[in-house]
Every structure is written in structure tokens, then in C-alpha cells.
Design a protein with these regions (language model features):
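Conserved ABC ATPase signature
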Residues: 134-138, 142
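Conserved ABC ATPase "signature" region
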Residues: 111-130
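Conserved ABC transporter NBD signature motif
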Residues: 59-75
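Catalytic Walker B motif of ABC-type/P-loop ATPase nucleotide-binding domains
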Residues: 159-163
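Conserved catalytic motifs of ABC-family nucleotide-binding domains
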Residues: 155
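Conserved catalytic loops of ABC-family nucleotide-binding domains
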Residues: 179-189
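Helix-to-loop junction immediately C-terminal to a conserved catalytic motif
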Residues: 51
Length: 189
């Protein structure tokens, strides 16, 4: 099994407040990991360090592809739902498509293959009937599925989920877990 991420003695802080101290972790290609702890325990901070959104005070993080060190990985990210502006005028299709933004030239249309991939992910999430709806019209669970679609449309090597089932409705919950099992065949979670 190939190593994907190696975190070695990371310390992270916000100003003078240390949130993580000497954290080490190795993530392997087919891993499905959960990080649990109390509110304010540093879970989201660790995710921010992995995503490159927060520079650690000390320690190192290394990424690998096929056992070879690389500067970065394709990472999909599903944020906590409370970080989303529901008033932003964007459709379900556009949100999922935005997960491919780095793969298309600016101000150009998506390729036919990309459009097919976007449509495939929308179907996979069970959102076909909401295709053109604005995100402001969606329930919390529907929006969570849209954001999950955005995070996987690029076929990431690593998928980071921050409180992924907090808004998933009971009707979709078992399908959600099966979906994560399917995604884990292509991505470490």
C-alpha cells in the first residue's frame, strides 16, 4: 500500500494560542480515517494544515504519489455546512462544476467529457431533479450532497470531509455511507 501523506510533529497555532502540538499521522492510499474529538480540539485546524490553508508553526507535511514525494495532491474538500453563503446565486450544476474549475481554462466552457462527469456526479448524489435549482432553495441535506459532489467531481486522491453527516437527512444517510465506500475505492478519505 502506498503512503499518501506523512505529517511529522506538526504544531499549529492561531496567534499565540497553540491548537495542535507535535501531531504526527500517516495516511495511506486506501485509508478511510475519522478524526474525533471535542469542539475546539483542533480537528478543523489539522484539516486546514493538510489543505495548505494554515502554515504550521513547526513540523512537516509531505505528500506522495505512487510512493514518490510530490509537492501537492488533488484534494477534494467538503467544508462544514455553516461556512456556505446560501444567498449566493448559483445552481446545483454550477456548484458541482466548480469542483473542476482548476482543470478548465478561465472563461472557457467545460469540455463534453467534463459536462458528462458533472452530470454523472449529480446523478450519483441523487440530485437530478434539482439540477438547475439555486442552492438557497435546498434543504441542509440536499446542499450537503451538492457540496460532496463538488468535492469528488475532480476524482481527488484525498477527500477531506469536515463534519460530513451533520446535515444529511435520514432518508439519504445509508446511501451517503455507501457512497463514501464507493468514493474510497478511488480516494483516501
Amino acid at each position: 500500500m502506498d503512503k499518501l501523506i506523512e505529517i511529522d510533529k506538526i504544531t499549529a497555532a492561531y496567534g499565540s494560542k497553540v491548537v495542535l502540538k507535535d501531531v504526527s499521522l500517516t495516511v495511506w492510499k486506501d485509508d478511510f480515517l475519522g478524526i474525533i474529538g471535542p469542539n475546539g480540539g483542533g480537528k478543523t485546524t489539522l484539516l486546514k494544515v493538510i489543505l495548505g490553508l494554515l502554515q504550521p508553526v513547526s513540523g512537516s507535511i509531505r505528500f506522495y504519489q505512487d510512493g514518490v514525494p510530490v509537492s501537492s495532491l488533488r484534494i477534494g474538500y467538503l467544508p462544514q455546512l455553516n461556512n456556505i453563503d446560501r444567498k449566493f446565486p448559483i445552481s446545483v450544476w454550477e456548484v458541482v462544476a466548480s469542483g473542476l474549475a482548476a482543470e478548465k481554462p478561465r472563461f472557457r466552457s467545460y469540455t463534453e467529457a467534463q459536462k458528462l462527469r458533472i452530470d454523472e456526479v449529480i446523478r450519483q448524489m441523487g440530485l437530478e431533479e434539482l439540477y438547475t435549482r439555486s442552492i438557497g432553495e435546498l434543504s441542509g441535506g440536499q446542499l450537503q450532497r451538492v457540496l460532496l459532489g463538488r468535492s469528488i467531481v475532480s476524482r481527488p486522491q484525498l477527500l477531506i470531509l469536515d463534519e460530513p453527516n451533520s446535515y444529511v437527512d435520514k432518508r439519504f444517510e445509508s446511501r451517503f455511507y455507501k457512497l463514501l465506500e464507493e468514493i474510497n475505492k478511488e480516494s483516501a478519505i
